[in-house]
Amino acid sequence: MTSQSTTPTTQEVILLIEVTAVALAAHPFLHGMSHGHLAVLADAASDVTFPAKHRLFEDDHGATRFWLIQSGHVTLDLHVPGRGRMNIESIGMGELLGWSWLFPPYKWAFGAVAASPVEAFEFDARTVRARCAADPVLGYEVTRRVARVLSKRLQSTRVRLITVSIQPVGVR
């Protein structure tokens, strides 16, 4: 920006979007996405940090955002009646946190709490959904990437369930 004006020029705004798009391109979840689509997503993103023990969301609450973790870990948990919160999985650097924002009724399936200090890109879910609806190629790319994450996590859950089910009674 010029020293006499607080309003950025068009060139400066484009540069800011490009820098953010470049930062997004470095995240494994978005690896290989076109620069144009990264710029569209960058416009809906912001850099955020969370301290350890900060609750990002509760299960069954509205899913209005999602995150791409840059550093730190987040624990997914679930409230089990009569037992309290049960840890389900740990999400770390390079991973997507949140997929419920993409599918109606847009409510979190799990809760999430920062297990350590976390740095992430935070996205406005409504904006990203609208942009995906307006650009079917972007929508396909985002949905395909989320589906890949869901498939991986389902397989991980399957392995954990098998491990738990073969343990002798009383060991759990």
What residues fall within each predicted segment?
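Cytosolic regulatory regions built on CNB/CRP/Popeye-like sensor folds
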Residues: 1-172
